[in-house]
């Protein structure tokens, strides 16, 4: 298929650059193909409660980045992760990426509370996705800083040198220069905070 050709090409290109590949799995039927090329599987917000996909991804033993569903409580989110863990896959990271609220100024509302609450309830690493959490590039860095200060173990950031022509998510992508500044400031914040 065209997807397989694209993924094999992009996978080869990233391997040449010695970069790991994280890609989203949308359906159980695509799992074997994606596992051939990806270093980590992403299960997006819309599939957070796709239990068949969670079980099969758990069996794959590939690391999984599980994104929180837009209307998923934190307890429900942790129970979704249990489907992966129950299959013996201990390489699971949870990703806060914003929830649906009544607010319309941003695409989603980044739930900063989720980070310390999840850190208290689970041993799994917590990744923050401020790009999807806001939907606008100008809010990505401030929310990233807040997430690091709240205890996030990592960030998922979209970067594009020409976001205006990006095939998707251009409006929430940082240009490389802004990304580099954000990384440096995030390191300063992370190094200045001592977590228990």
Across the structure, where does each feature detected by a protein language model lie?
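Hydrophobic faces of well-ordered beta-strands that scaffold small-molecule active sites
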Residues: 21-23, 41-43, 64, 92-96, ...
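Catalytic cores of alpha/beta
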Residues: 29-35, 76-80, 136-149
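Conserved anion-binding
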Residues: 46-113
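Charged helix-capping and loop-helix junction motifs
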Residues: 107-113, 138-145, 172-176
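C-terminal helical cap(s) of enzyme catalytic domains, especially alpha/beta-barrels
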Residues: 162-195
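Glycine-rich phosphate-binding active-site loops on the catalytic face of alpha/beta enzymes
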Residues: 45-49, 150-172
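Single conserved hydrophobic/aromatic residue that forms the stacking wall/gate
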Residues: 1-11, 16
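Active-site beta-loop-alpha junctions enriched in small/polar residues
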Residues: 26-28, 46, 69-71, 97-101, ...
């Amino acid at each position: 298929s065209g997807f397989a050709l694209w993924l094999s090409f992009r996978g080869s290109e990233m391997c040449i650059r010695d970069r790991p590949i994280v890609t989203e799995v949308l359906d159980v039927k695509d799992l074997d193909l994606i596992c051939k090329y990806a270093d980590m599987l992403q299960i997006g917000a819309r599939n957070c409660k796709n239990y068949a996909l969670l079980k099969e991804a758990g069996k794959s033993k590939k690391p999984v980045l599980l994104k929180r569903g837009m209307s998923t409580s934190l307890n429900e989110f942790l129970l979704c992760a249990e489907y992966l863990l129950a299959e013996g896959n201990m390489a699971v990271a949870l990703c806060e990426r914003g929830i649906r609220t009544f607010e319309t100024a941003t695409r989603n509302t980044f739930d900063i509370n989720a980070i310390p609450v999840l850190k208290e309830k689970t041993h799994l690493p917590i990744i923050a996705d401020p790009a999807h959490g806001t939907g606008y590039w100008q809010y990505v860095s401030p929310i990233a800083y807040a997430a690091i200060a709240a205890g996030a173990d990592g960030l998922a950031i979209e970067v594009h040198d020409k976001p205006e022509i990006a095939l998707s998510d251009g409006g929430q992508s940082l240009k490389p220069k802004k990304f580099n500044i954000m990384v440096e400031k995030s390191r300063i914040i992370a190094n200045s905070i001592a977590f228990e």
